[in-house]
Amino acid sequence: MPLYRYKALDAHGEMLDGQMEAANDAEVALRLQEQGHLPVETRLATGENGSPSLRMLLRKKPFDNAALVQFTQQLATLIGAGQPLDRALSILMDLPEDDKSRRVIADIRDTVRGGAPLSVALERQHGLFSKLYINMVRAGEAGGSMQDTLQRLADYLERSRALKGKVINALIYPAILLAVVGCALLFLLGYVVPQFAQMYESLDVALPWFTQAVLSVGLLVRDWWLVLVVIPGVLGLWLDRKRRNAAFRAALDAWLLRQKVIGSLIARLETARLTRTLGTLLRNGVPLLAAIGIARNVMSNTALVEDVAAAADDVKNGHGLSMSLARGKRFPRLALQMIQVGEESGALDTMLLKTADTFELETAQAIDRALAALVPLITLVLASVVGLVIISVLVPLYDLTNAIG
């Protein structure tokens, strides 16, 4: 069985640091609870030399998404166990493996010990914690339900991270497939095909038009391969720079939404983000207008962000959220209907979270369907291109062999 390291609080509030063999981290937590301890952290042990994980070495900022989720969950657990806030932060300060995270937690603890609320301490971390995070903590402080607020916040962050990871993971295999076959095609055109071109030129044989075309492309790739390699990189840098231009990005995002397949996927994904954020904020007591202002910052499509900004103005003037979002005609009808039901029933936060569940599931299913169709299509197209190149250079050789025979 794998070896796990754990940190736990005993009945006297002292931190225990140890190891045990278990099938999974849930078993470690259960065995610690049976011993009367409160599990704070469980993770697979590193190698014998205690070397840090690659993820820790590559982390550039104190808290990545996974670390922020872990920090929030652990803080909720400690507060729920009756630990004072400054004591809980002191315990958490010893858990991270990197010095940057320890310094951040220490600074937050010192600010709290100075009499400031947690939300103010987080706000002083120069943008490390999002407005959503800070406002939810502030709402929890006002409502006296810090543990529940932190647990909901951890759940929100975990769901957001999982959805983002789903999208990224779906793109990895097609990207690798394109890269591998693209390199093989470049090698075929830039090295193999020119060998045939020289051979046919020395034999002075008549070639079909399609063979001549492939040989010309092969010679072009051989002579200008460096330019052909650099062009995509330059184009990518140009597009990245253009996307920073507000007008260009707005036009591009609006155009993407009008595309049948990708536009529908983007709309579902952004709807899930918006409704998950709004529902979580409203459930924690953040006013609707403030929640809308925060929620639009988690969206990436500028066209939909503009629709949400316009909806905020309408809500300010007394209109309902569903009707205000409907004016842009970009959000899915089902989402608008579910939001309207929530407004009419007085359970807007609940319906927003249910809407998020629905569209997160739809997004995941849409990605799976797209991937199931895209990978075979890419494979078929690239295999056909490679096959046509091979056939086009071998057909004249076959004809020549038959003529000699």
From Swiss-Prot:
Residues 1-169, 240-370 are cytoplasmic. Residues 191-218, 392-405 are periplasmic. GO terms for molecular function: metal ion binding. Its main location: membrane. The chain crosses the membrane at residues 170-190, 219-239, 371-391. Ca(2+) binds at residues 98, 151, 155. Type II secretion system is composed of four main components: the outer membrane complex, the inner membrane complex, the cytoplasmic secretion ATPase and the periplasm-spanning pseudopilus. Homodimer. Interacts with XpsE and XpsL components. NCBIfam families: T3SSXpsF. Belongs to the GSP F family. Component of the type II secretion system inner membrane complex required for the energy-dependent secretion of extracellular factors such as proteases and toxins from the periplasm. This is Type II secretion system protein F. It comes from Xanthomonas campestris pv. campestris (strain ATCC 33913 / DSM 3586 / NCPPB 528 / LMG 568 / P 25). The lineage of its organism: Bacteria, Pseudomonadati, Pseudomonadota, Gammaproteobacteria, Lysobacterales.
